[in-house]
Amino acid sequence: MTQRIIGLTGGIATGKTTVANYLASAHNLPIFDADIYARDAVSLGSPILDAIARRYGKEILLPDGSLNRPKLGEMIFQNQDQRHWVESLIHPYVRDRFLKAIAESTSPILVLVIPLLIEVQMTNLVTEIWVVICSESQQLQRLMERNHLTLEQAQARINSQLSLKEKAAIADVVLDNSSSLDALLKQVDIALNFEL
């Protein structure tokens, strides 16, 4: 039997983590998360962090020498060229980590949580694409509350990604997270039991 590799994506603050946590806890599936790999890529002493500090100066670092992620986020979500430069350093590292995880896993089903799955052309790593969506107003509200952002900051982050409509059009499975948690988890169970 071929390995199922689910690419779990969606817009920022749509519920990807909720779905991933459920797949791990209720279905005992291995979860590999791009955000964790991206944090590893810029860990203290990493060549990528050094390159970022050289480009933006020491003010991009916290007193302990680690990356000031909110400050970098503010800079790159306002400037597409800066965002692309940072992503060009981080994404190859993340891709390599996914390839290693896939090669080493013996599980029949893997879940790769990749917020920018479509945007950074990592769809070739997966056998199916699951997109978590919700209404635009819910997404904005959730993001502002979760990340303590202003409306303008939240909108800039949302605008840096493909729209939910564009992601849903490419998806094999669309999970609608605009109503209850129970409704979302039922959709996950159905999608998991349905082989493409």
From Swiss-Prot:
<keyword id="KW-0067">ATP-binding</keyword>
<protein>
    <recommendedName>
        <fullName>Dephospho-CoA kinase</fullName>
        <ecNumber>2.7.1.24</ecNumber>
    </recommendedName>
</protein>
<feature type="binding site">
    <location>
        <begin position="13"/>
        <end position="18"/>
    </location>
    <ligand>
        <name>ATP</name>
    </ligand>
</feature>
<dbReference type="GO" id="GO:0005524">
    <property type="term" value="F:ATP binding"/>
</dbReference>
<feature type="domain" description="DPCK">
    <location>
        <begin position="5"/>
        <end position="196"/>
    </location>
</feature>
<dbReference type="GO" id="GO:0004140">
    <property type="term" value="F:dephospho-CoA kinase activity"/>
</dbReference>
<keyword id="KW-0547">Nucleotide-binding</keyword>
<dbReference type="GO" id="GO:0015937">
    <property type="term" value="P:coenzyme A biosynthetic process"/>
</dbReference>
<keyword id="KW-0418">Kinase</keyword>
<keyword id="KW-0963">Cytoplasm</keyword>
<dbReference type="InterPro" id="IPR027417">
    <property type="entry name" value="P-loop_NTPase"/>
</dbReference>
<dbReference type="GO" id="GO:0005737">
    <property type="term" value="C:cytoplasm"/>
</dbReference>
<dbReference type="Pfam" id="PF01121">
    <property type="entry name" value="CoaE"/>
</dbReference>
<keyword id="KW-0173">Coenzyme A biosynthesis</keyword>
<comment type="pathway">
    <text>Cofactor biosynthesis; coenzyme A biosynthesis; CoA from (R)-pantothenate: step 5/5.</text>
</comment>
<comment type="function">
    <text>Catalyzes the phosphorylation of the 3'-hydroxyl group of dephosphocoenzyme A to form coenzyme A.</text>
</comment>
<keyword id="KW-0808">Transferase</keyword>
<comment type="similarity">
    <text>Belongs to the CoaE family.</text>
</comment>
<dbReference type="InterPro" id="IPR001977">
    <property type="entry name" value="Depp_CoAkinase"/>
</dbReference>
